[in-house]
Swiss-Prot record:
Signal peptide: none annotated. SUPFAM superfamilies: Hedgehog/intein (Hint) domain, P-loop containing nucleoside triphosphate hydrolases, post-AAA+ oligomerization domain-like. Part of the RFC clamp loader complex which loads the PCNA sliding clamp onto DNA. The gene is rfcS. PROSITE patterns: INTEIN_C_TER, INTEIN_N_TER. GO terms for biological process: DNA repair; DNA-templated DNA replication; intein-mediated protein splicing. GO terms for cellular component: DNA replication factor C complex. GO terms for molecular function: ATP binding; ATP hydrolysis activity; DNA binding; DNA clamp loader activity. The lineage of its organism: Archaea, Methanobacteriati, Methanobacteriota, Methanomada group, Methanopyri. This protein undergoes a protein self splicing that involves a post-translational excision of the intervening region (intein) followed by peptide ligation. This is Replication factor C small subunit. Belongs to the activator 1 small subunits family. RfcS subfamily.
């Protein structure tokens, strides 16, 4: 990699050039003047920052905290987020193909060069558990990310996982699965992993790994082989149960083993396969004993004799259950019996925490949203995690309370709690937040940032002073980009600046991200580079496609669509958004047709979000435009 490219990629320019003082915020003078008045007073009310993404809401909150609290601003400022680190391994299924990747790979697939913390996902599945604790695939609806400065490395007996202290891991208690913060676990705690036999439908083509040399990886098609073939392959690779391999291959093989019914452990030298004396048959003893006690207290003594190192085997529990007359059980005892039966038949087992380290970190951390249960497996060996996006009711009731109870540092009169994208809070979470705001009004001030203030409940709006952040004008974005380019020694054409303004749509954060990504190529930035980097088509190309569809040349419109998808690597939702953007500026489309076109675009965007085939839906959208063109032209 060239020296210039290394320098460009070293620090995200969004952070490097983020304003540190209120006076440096771009083109929000009406906001800045009001905030400076609070600094002069040394006090402030609760605030609601409302406006489009990338207009300075987060920056304004950070600048306000710096000027109010000085060197102690970090101690007195809480920004809520929680996720796993970028290099955390995860097994996914994308378009029917099973892949062992990292969250950094998911970032490149779905965020690309776009800014933001959320992206909708329609073609991705991850491993989770069903209500019987059996491992299964489940659809992902969103990929979530944010930046973190500290992470927690959890050393397990089978491998490691890195996550923020606020990320939730799943544990087992007598009521079933329960989410707890990673910061609450300690040496000797038990997390949940799995060993299961998952059969896949093989895709065509591909090769199978037959060796584990330094440059190899387990091929994607290997995960799709029949279970018995995978097991035989693992036996052939293993020497006395150990496969010496690189770190990546070791993790590949560990996951391959786990979905093939073989227990695996990642070690410094490779991966160890466990054929006998499996911890994969063990459950945490404490919740199991409590459940057994509900059946019959005498059975507890029988089961305790099987407990070792805080765990008990599923077989021992099964033997105890065989002596229970289930027909005569009622109420709580019957529920306990059902839970125990579910556990002994489940794929999950207890994995012990051996050590924990807090580490410095500078980068994105991630989460996925899994509709239905919000649980997913990730790690060197799979660990059951819970989506910990911090705008949920649990954080409102716990983390905010804990932070609010501590004394402000540096003689400050209050602390600031910043909730970004607060319009994504559930109504229950907002009601909880309202009560917290009332309870800690003396010690804390809240800043809520939202794209849409209308999504914030009235009781919260009435407790806040509202600041409206306006969409940044093109001139302000261009001026900022020119200064950054000059500071970094990057040459950029005027056409390229226009292109960045177009793709960023008033979002300064995205504009700077696109500039940095384009600069990494190490040459003068022109408009071709910008559109390619941003995975965005030129507006005239989209208008040409719409023109042909509207005027009856469906085949040509279809050809142009496929060119856009191939040349720019655009997603279906990207295409739909650009079509929506361009139809308003096309003189040939009569004004009375616009509402019908907008309605059609909305229909097809919804279908894509729901997971429909992209090409089919995009071609169907062109067909709808074609039909409307015929209707309005009298054809």
């Amino acid at each position: 990699m060239a020296e210039h490219e290394l320098r460009v990629l070293e620090i995200p320019w969004v952070e490097k050039y983020r304003p540190k003082r209120l006076d440096d915020i771009v083109d929000q003078e009406h906001v800045v003047e009001r905030l400076k008045a609070y600094v002069n007073r040394g006090d402030m009310p609760n605030l609601l920052f409302a406006g489009p993404p990338g207009t300075g809401k987060t920056t304004a909150a950070l600048c306000l905290a710096r000027e109010l609290f000085g060197e102690h601003w970090r101690d007195n400022f809480l920004e809520l987020n929680a996720s796993v680190s970028a290099d955390t391994p995860i097994l996914v299924r994308r378009g029917g193909e099973v892949l062992r990747v990292t969250f950094e790979d998911l970032d490149s697939w779905y965020f690309g060069d776009r800014g933001g913390e959320y992206v909708d996902v329609s073609d991705l599945e991850v491993l989770t558990v069903d209500r019987n604790f059996r491992v299964t695939w489940a659809r992902v609806s969103k990929l979530i990310r944010h930046r973190a400065r500290k992470i927690l490395r959890v050393h397990l007996e089978d491998g490691t996982i890195e996550l923020t202290g606020n990320h939730a891991v799943m544990v087992l208690d007598e009521g079933g699965l329960r989410a707890v913060k990673a910061s609450e676990i300690e040496e000797g705690s038990f997390l949940l992993s799995f060993v299961a036999e998952l059969d896949e439908q093989p895709t065509d083509g591909g090769t199978v790994v037959t060796s584990v040399g330094s440059g190899s990886r387990v091929s994607d098609t290997t995960y799709e082989l029949p279970v018995e073939v995978r097991v035989e392959l693992l036996r052939e690779l293993a020497d006395d149960g150990v496969i010496e391999a690189s770190e990546d291959v070791s993790v590949d093989l560990a996951w391959l083993a786990r979905i093939s019914g073989v227990e695996s452990r990642v070690t410094d030298d490779g991966v160890e396969l466990v054929w006998e004396t499996r911890t994969g048959d063990l459950l945490p003893a404490d919740p199991v004993l409590k459940l057994v006690e509900r059946l019959e207290s005498d059975l507890v003594d029988d089961l305790e004799s099987w407990v070792f190192d805080g765990r008990v085997s599923k077989e021992a529990v099964r033997k105890v259950l065989s002596s229970v007359d289930a027909k005569n059980l009622r109420g709580d005892a019957r529920r306990a019996y059902r839970m125990l039966r579910t556990l002994v038949r489940s794929d999950v087992h207890a994995v012990k925490v051996e050590d924990l380290d807090v580490m410095d970190y500078d980068g994105y951390v991630y989460d996925v949203s899994v509709p239905g249960n919000e649980m997913f497996f990730a790690g060197e060996v799979p660990v059951l995690l819970h989506n910990s996006d911090e705008r949920g009711i649990d954080v409102i009731r716990t983390k905010v309370k804990n932070f609010a109870r501590t004394r402000p540092m540096g003689g400050a009169r209050f602390k600031i709690i910043f909730l970004d994208e607060a319009d994504n809070l559930t109504r229950d979470s907002q009601q909880a937040l309202r009560r917290i705001m009332e309870m800690y009004s003396d010690a804390c001030r809240f800043i809520l940032a939202a794209n849409y203030s209308s999504a914030i409940i009235d009781p919260i709006q009435s407790r806040c002073v509202v600041f409206k952040f306006t969409k940044l004008p093109e001139s302000a974005i261009k001026e900022r980009l020119r200064k950054i380019a000059e500071s970094e020694g990057v040459e950029i054409t005027e056409d390229a600046l226009d292109a960045i303004v177009y793709v960023s749509e008033g979002d300064m954060r995205r504009a700077i991200n696109v500039l940095q990504a384009a600069a990494a190529l190490g040459r003068e930035i022109d408009e071709d580079t910008v559109f390619q980097i941003a995975a965005t088509a030129r507006p005239e190309e989209v208008r040409e496609m719409i023109h042909h569809a509207w005027n009856g040349d469906f085949e040509r419109a279809r050809e142009l669509l496929h060119e856009l998808l191939t040349r720019y690597g655009m997603s279906g939702e990207d295409v739909v958004r650009q079509v929506h953007r361009e139809i308003f500026d096309m003189d040939e489309i009569p004004e009375e047709a616009i509402p019908e076109l907008v309605n059609a675009v909305g229909d097809f965007e919804y279908r894509l979000i729901r997971g429909s085939d992209e090409r089919i839906q995009l071609e169907a959208l062109l067909a709808r435009i074609h039909a409307l063109g015929n209707e309005y032209s009298g054809g």
